[in-house]
């Protein structure tokens, strides 16, 4: 066997391994994982935002800038976890993947793995978002 094809085969297998090491989380598993919790996400190694999950599938998303959005989540027929927010009525559907390192990745439908949101922390502390329609 020539060295170049062997190297190409090795590189192909090495790049495919991380994808094989991730498991898609079902909607039921997702509900058990997030209900009553706040997940903090990183993108490209930097803090990106956090989402608080309530018993009735309501959510509050907060960008690191502090901008908060309220919404709901549901599973679509493809098994993706979809979110609809008050400020954006179009569903945003994600696959949640569990890695061998125990961290979860959220991948927007049809986006490359490079744009994944990665859980930095799963806790129970509520987000600091004001209630809607409250004056100052």
Model-identified regions with their sequence ranges:
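Positively charged n-region of N-terminal signal peptides that target proteins for export
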Residues: 1-5
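Bacterial N-terminal signal peptides
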Residues: 6-15
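Lipid interaction determinants
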Residues: 17-72, 78-136
